[in-house]
Protein backbone atom coordinates (compact mmCIF):
# COMPACT_ATOMS: atom_id res chain seq x y z
CA UNK A 1 0.00 0.00 0.00
CA UNK A 2 1.24 3.45 -0.90
CA UNK A 3 -0.06 6.42 1.02
CA UNK A 4 0.33 10.13 0.46
CA UNK A 5 -0.54 13.14 2.64
CA UNK A 6 -4.10 14.43 2.54
CA UNK A 7 -3.10 17.59 4.44
CA UNK A 8 -0.25 19.42 6.16
CA UNK A 9 -0.17 20.95 9.62
CA UNK A 10 0.55 24.61 10.37
CA UNK A 11 1.99 25.08 13.86
CA UNK A 12 4.11 27.52 15.92
CA UNK A 13 7.03 25.05 15.96
CA UNK A 14 9.49 25.29 13.08
CA UNK A 15 11.68 22.56 14.63
CA UNK A 16 10.79 19.53 16.73
CA UNK A 17 12.32 21.00 19.91
CA UNK A 18 9.53 22.11 22.20
CA UNK A 19 6.74 20.21 20.45
CA UNK A 20 4.58 18.66 23.22
CA UNK A 21 5.39 15.01 23.82
CA UNK A 22 1.71 14.05 23.71
CA UNK A 23 -1.44 15.51 22.24
CA UNK A 24 -3.82 17.14 24.70
CA UNK A 25 -1.21 18.16 27.29
CA UNK A 26 -0.95 21.74 25.97
CA UNK A 27 -4.61 22.48 25.43
CA UNK A 28 -4.12 26.16 24.55
CA UNK A 29 -1.80 25.41 21.63
CA UNK A 30 -3.57 26.09 18.34
CA UNK A 31 -2.77 24.94 14.83
CA UNK A 32 -4.36 24.51 11.41
CA UNK A 33 -4.79 21.53 9.14
CA UNK A 34 -4.61 22.57 5.47
CA UNK A 35 -5.92 19.98 3.02
CA UNK A 36 -4.32 19.21 -0.31
CA UNK A 37 -6.24 20.63 -3.27
CA UNK A 38 -8.01 17.40 -4.24
CA UNK A 39 -9.68 17.27 -0.80
CA UNK A 40 -10.78 20.91 -0.66
CA UNK A 41 -14.36 19.91 -1.34
CA UNK A 42 -17.43 20.34 0.83
CA UNK A 43 -18.36 16.67 0.42
CA UNK A 44 -15.06 15.50 1.97
CA UNK A 45 -15.62 17.43 5.21
CA UNK A 46 -19.41 17.24 5.40
CA UNK A 47 -20.55 16.38 8.95
CA UNK A 48 -17.13 16.83 10.55
CA UNK A 49 -18.27 20.03 12.27
CA UNK A 50 -20.58 17.93 14.45
CA UNK A 51 -17.63 16.30 16.24
CA UNK A 52 -15.65 17.90 19.07
CA UNK A 53 -12.43 15.87 18.69
CA UNK A 54 -10.66 14.14 15.81
CA UNK A 55 -7.87 11.61 15.44
CA UNK A 56 -4.90 12.48 13.25
CA UNK A 57 -2.65 9.89 11.63
CA UNK A 58 0.57 11.59 10.62
CA UNK A 59 4.30 11.19 10.03
CA UNK A 60 7.23 11.99 12.32
CA UNK A 61 8.78 13.67 9.29
CA UNK A 62 11.60 15.34 11.24
CA UNK A 63 12.86 12.03 12.64
CA UNK A 64 14.90 9.28 11.07
CA UNK A 65 13.34 5.83 10.89
CA UNK A 66 13.88 4.04 14.20
CA UNK A 67 16.04 0.91 14.12
CA UNK A 68 16.09 0.12 17.83
CA UNK A 69 13.40 -2.14 19.23
CA UNK A 70 13.88 -0.71 22.74
CA UNK A 71 13.58 2.97 23.67
CA UNK A 72 13.94 5.20 26.75
CA UNK A 73 10.66 7.06 27.42
CA UNK A 74 11.02 10.55 28.99
CA UNK A 75 8.42 9.50 31.55
CA UNK A 76 10.99 7.05 32.94
CA UNK A 77 13.65 9.74 33.15
CA UNK A 78 15.55 8.38 30.17
CA UNK A 79 16.98 5.65 32.40
CA UNK A 80 14.84 2.60 31.67
CA UNK A 81 14.04 0.90 28.40
CA UNK A 82 10.74 -0.47 27.13
CA UNK A 83 9.81 -1.98 23.79
CA UNK A 84 9.20 0.52 21.02
CA UNK A 85 5.62 -0.75 20.68
CA UNK A 86 5.03 -0.12 24.40
CA UNK A 87 5.97 3.53 23.95
CA UNK A 88 5.00 6.70 22.09
CA UNK A 89 8.56 7.18 20.84
CA UNK A 90 8.86 9.16 17.57
CA UNK A 91 11.65 6.79 16.47
CA UNK A 92 9.49 4.01 15.06
CA UNK A 93 9.78 1.53 12.19
CA UNK A 94 7.13 3.35 10.13
CA UNK A 95 7.36 6.81 11.76
CA UNK A 96 3.57 7.11 12.15
CA UNK A 97 2.03 9.27 14.86
CA UNK A 98 -1.49 9.17 16.29
CA UNK A 99 -2.99 12.22 18.01
CA UNK A 100 -6.37 13.22 19.37
CA UNK A 101 -7.01 16.96 19.02
CA UNK A 102 -9.90 19.30 19.71
CA UNK A 103 -11.69 20.54 16.61
CA UNK A 104 -12.33 24.29 16.85
CA UNK A 105 -13.61 25.13 13.37
CA UNK A 106 -14.16 23.71 9.90
CA UNK A 107 -13.77 25.82 6.76
CA UNK A 108 -14.92 23.53 3.95
CA UNK A 109 -14.52 26.22 1.30
CA UNK A 110 -10.82 26.73 2.04
CA UNK A 111 -10.13 23.19 3.24
CA UNK A 112 -8.85 24.28 6.65
CA UNK A 113 -9.49 22.86 10.11
CA UNK A 114 -8.46 24.76 13.23
CA UNK A 115 -7.55 22.53 16.16
CA UNK A 116 -6.00 22.76 19.61
CA UNK A 117 -3.88 20.44 21.73
CA UNK A 118 -1.79 19.02 18.89
CA UNK A 119 1.73 17.61 19.23
CA UNK A 120 2.84 18.22 15.64
CA UNK A 121 5.55 20.46 14.23
CA UNK A 122 4.96 22.88 11.37
CA UNK A 123 4.44 21.30 7.93
CA UNK A 124 3.89 17.80 9.34
CA UNK A 125 2.22 15.56 6.72
CA UNK A 126 -1.15 14.14 7.77
CA UNK A 127 -2.33 10.89 6.19
CA UNK A 128 -5.81 10.48 7.63
CA UNK A 129 -8.37 12.12 9.90
CA UNK A 130 -11.09 10.28 11.78
CA UNK A 131 -13.72 11.55 14.23
CA UNK A 132 -13.29 10.78 17.92
CA UNK A 133 -16.27 8.73 19.14
CA UNK A 134 -16.47 8.61 22.93
CA UNK A 135 -18.50 5.41 23.37
CA UNK A 136 -15.80 3.28 21.75
CA UNK A 137 -12.66 5.45 21.95
CA UNK A 138 -12.74 6.42 25.65
CA UNK A 139 -11.41 3.98 28.26
CA UNK A 140 -10.98 6.07 31.44
CA UNK A 141 -10.42 3.05 33.70
CA UNK A 142 -7.74 1.42 31.53
CA UNK A 143 -4.36 0.63 33.07
CA UNK A 144 -1.49 2.42 31.33
CA UNK A 145 1.68 0.52 32.20
CA UNK A 146 4.64 2.58 33.41
CA UNK A 147 2.66 5.80 32.84
CA UNK A 148 0.47 4.99 35.85
CA UNK A 149 3.49 4.87 38.15
CA UNK A 150 5.33 7.97 36.95
CA UNK A 151 3.57 11.29 37.44
CA UNK A 152 4.74 14.01 35.06
CA UNK A 153 5.67 17.11 37.03
CA UNK A 154 4.88 20.52 35.55
CA UNK A 155 7.46 23.28 36.03
CA UNK A 156 6.81 26.87 36.98
CA UNK A 157 7.51 29.41 34.22
CA UNK A 158 8.62 32.99 34.89
CA UNK A 159 10.23 35.86 32.95
CA UNK A 160 13.72 36.70 34.18
CA UNK A 161 12.83 40.37 34.76
CA UNK A 162 10.18 43.02 34.17
CA UNK A 163 11.72 43.93 30.81
CA UNK A 164 11.24 40.38 29.52
CA UNK A 165 7.69 40.35 30.87
CA UNK A 166 6.95 43.46 28.82
CA UNK A 167 8.71 41.99 25.80
CA UNK A 168 6.46 38.94 25.99
CA UNK A 169 3.38 41.16 26.04
CA UNK A 170 4.64 43.19 23.08
CA UNK A 171 5.56 40.11 21.02
CA UNK A 172 2.74 37.63 21.55
CA UNK A 173 -1.01 37.70 22.10
CA UNK A 174 -2.43 36.65 25.49
CA UNK A 175 -3.45 33.33 23.97
CA UNK A 176 0.03 32.73 22.53
CA UNK A 177 1.70 33.59 25.86
CA UNK A 178 -0.54 31.12 27.67
CA UNK A 179 0.35 28.42 25.13
CA UNK A 180 4.08 29.23 25.37
CA UNK A 181 3.98 28.95 29.17
CA UNK A 182 2.13 25.63 28.88
CA UNK A 183 4.82 24.35 26.50
CA UNK A 184 7.70 25.43 28.75
CA UNK A 185 5.98 24.01 31.85
CA UNK A 186 6.40 20.57 30.23
CA UNK A 187 10.20 21.06 30.41
CA UNK A 188 11.09 20.39 26.75
CA UNK A 189 14.78 19.66 27.44
CA UNK A 190 16.19 16.27 26.39
CA UNK A 191 16.49 13.96 29.37
CA UNK A 192 20.27 13.60 29.09
CA UNK A 193 20.76 17.38 29.27
CA UNK A 194 19.01 17.53 32.64
CA UNK A 195 21.85 15.59 34.23
CA UNK A 196 24.88 16.46 32.12
CA UNK A 197 24.32 20.21 31.77
CA UNK A 198 21.40 21.41 33.91
CA UNK A 199 22.26 25.14 33.67
CA UNK A 200 22.49 25.21 29.87
CA UNK A 201 20.64 27.92 27.92
CA UNK A 202 18.10 26.89 25.27
CA UNK A 203 16.33 28.48 22.34
CA UNK A 204 12.75 27.53 21.46
CA UNK A 205 11.52 28.56 18.00
CA UNK A 206 7.96 29.66 18.68
CA UNK A 207 6.11 31.22 15.75
CA UNK A 208 8.79 33.46 14.20
CA UNK A 209 10.65 34.18 17.46
CA UNK A 210 13.51 32.51 19.32
CA UNK A 211 12.55 32.23 23.00
CA UNK A 212 15.68 31.89 25.15
CA UNK A 213 15.35 30.14 28.51
CA UNK A 214 17.18 28.19 31.18
CA UNK A 215 16.02 26.00 34.04
CA UNK A 216 16.63 26.51 37.75
CA UNK A 217 15.50 23.50 39.79
CA UNK A 218 11.79 23.17 38.89
CA UNK A 219 11.42 26.60 37.29
CA UNK A 220 11.81 27.61 33.64
CA UNK A 221 13.19 31.15 33.36
CA UNK A 222 12.60 33.07 30.12
CA UNK A 223 15.74 35.12 29.42
CA UNK A 224 15.02 36.80 26.09
CA UNK A 225 12.93 36.84 22.93
CA UNK A 226 14.82 37.33 19.68
Located regions from the model:
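Arg/Lys-rich, positively charged N-terminal/basic patches that mediate binding to nucleic acids
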Residues: 1-42, 48-50, 134-183
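Active-site-adjacent substructure of cysteine-protease-like catalytic cores
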Residues: 44, 48-97, 192-198
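Short solvent-exposed strand/turn elements
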Residues: 111-133
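Short, conserved beta-turn/loop elements at beta-strand boundaries and strand-helix junctions
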Residues: 14, 106-113
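Residues located in well-ordered beta-strands
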Residues: 8, 99-104, 114, 125
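Short coil-to-beta-strand transition motifs
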Residues: 1-5, 91-100, 207
